[in-house]
């Protein structure tokens, strides 16, 4: 095959390509080298053909380089002219106009930014070489050309001024571009700062949530430690608790059959039903309170409005302070407890002898109340965080009969009818009336109970301000009845309920009057400057005693103070029957105030059963009902008076 054949073959190959390519403008050919993002397959194919034509047959592009354009530029054997035009005029997304949002920013182009930056770099290099030191950042963009104003004012050369004007305008334009770049950088930094602020707020919220959880856990730790100290202090780690714990662990680890589990569940339900049944049966039983015919003869021996000492009842041999007592005078039953004595003793008030005892509490009994209406029962509250309802008739029978076992079932008989167990700390005050029981505890909670079912009706939460909750107030020492500074007063020092009305006295010195129907305080009586230890109210008046060495008499109708009685020592206990107020103010005798006659006097110092210092004897608790006054001393003696 000769050279002529080769040229002919080449012309045969190039001829159809020239139909498409020979007529294309040179500008379009130059653009094809940069089309990296073209999506049309035909467009990519045409670009490759253009590049191949320039390399293989450079002479074929001569006509194009001469600028021969026209209608023949779009003629070919593969597509019509309109289709070829659309293909060759295609613009990809990179060549689209900027959106309105970007256009509104009016940012400098890449080339403009490059020009402005290059001029700055050149000036910086020149200054660094000349001065040998770097200027401050504020001079970075203000390196202007040195313009001699005298030359400008004196020259008449239009060419020189034109060149100088161009230089100045160039610098102005560069400064404008630099300002735009800096503002854009500032906007970006503001956006970053806002994002960091948002992240900071989120982190602070997480930290706050973590602090809340940490506080709750710290409260749990404090509660657990207090409970451990409480158990260690009173040595309450009994064998019964150990056996129960061991039994619970065995039940968790064992794989008992479903039949056994059902049987245990049924037995537990039966136990609950038996407890509820016993409580219901207790109210159905006839309750004949112990009545002594000699009581009327004895009471008539002493005339009213005169103070007469009747007897002293020694509570125990250890001389511990009386912590709680109550009595029902018409039937002559007295119940009392002393410090670190877990057993409540029942006395015949007319003969001064013990007729029963109530074992069951695991720690000191702090408060108690005898039902004065229908049932011969007693409710006690203890440091073991439980309340117990006792059958006093049954306690007499067990104590006098000395037969703790039933004949048929051999079941242990206990005078405790029901346990109220919801508080998490020691019980400090209780009061019941009709079918409702209210209890206050060191855990800052007040529970309202239904006596017929033994279930809690509602919970009342006390809220103290930080200044009140953290203050250290004086409190009565249980082992000597004296007031010791530096100890913390009871959170709930006293309370009394009557129907739906409830009055509470707390360590912040505030008396709160509650409506049990809504479970909220309706009035606050503020006046005491220290913790309240006792209170009593009737239909018109409320009397309160406090650690601030005072007794205050309030008018419930106007919430105003009617009278204030000051003492030398803190008030540990008081009682009120509408006419007489009896006050134990850590003195040897009981202070009596007759409101009708406005008279004050003190009971004389009675003889006591234990040897000791007369000056160290203090009144720890007082109770007054129907002309009978009973007070408990810090040495364990109980005195009975008629007023």
Curated annotation (Swiss-Prot):
A GO BP entry: regulation of transcription by RNA polymerase II
Membrane topology: Peripheral membrane protein
Chain positions covered by the region annotation Sufficient for interaction with FIS1: 74-126
Keyword Mitochondrion among record annotations: yes
Record keywords, A-Z: Coiled coil, Membrane, Mitochondrion, Mitochondrion outer membrane, Repeat, WD repeat
CDD domains named among the record's database cross-references: Mdv1_N, WD40
Localization: Mitochondrion outer membrane
Bridged cysteine pairs (disulfide): none
WD repeat copies, ranges: 317-357, 360-400, 422-461, 479-526, 527-566, 568-603, 614-643
Predominant place of localization: mitochondrion
Annotated region described as Required for interaction with FIS1 and MDV1, given as residue ranges: 1-274
Domain of life where this protein originates: Eukaryota
One Gene Ontology CC term in the entry: mitochondrion
Stated consequence of mutating residue 88 to A: Abolishes interaction with FIS1
UniProt-reported outcome of changing residue 114 to A: Abolishes interaction with FIS1
Pfam families documented for this protein: Caf4, WD40
Region (Disordered): 243-262
InterPro entries tied to this protein: Caf4, G-protein_beta_WD-40_rep, WD40/YVTN_repeat-like_dom_sf, WD40_repeat_CS, WD40_repeat_dom_sf, WD40_rpt
Coiled coil: 160-255
Role description: Involved in mitochondrial fission. Has a partially redundant function to MDV1 in acting as an adapter protein, binding to FIS1 on the mitochondrial outer membrane and recruiting the dynamin-like GTPase DNM1 to form mitochondrial fission complexes. Plays a key role in determining the polarized localization of those DNM1 clusters that are not immediately involved in the mitochondrial fission process.
Misc: Present with 589 molecules/cell in log phase SD medium.
Protein name: CCR4-associated factor 4
Provenance organism: Saccharomyces cerevisiae (strain ATCC 204508 / S288c) (Baker's yeast)
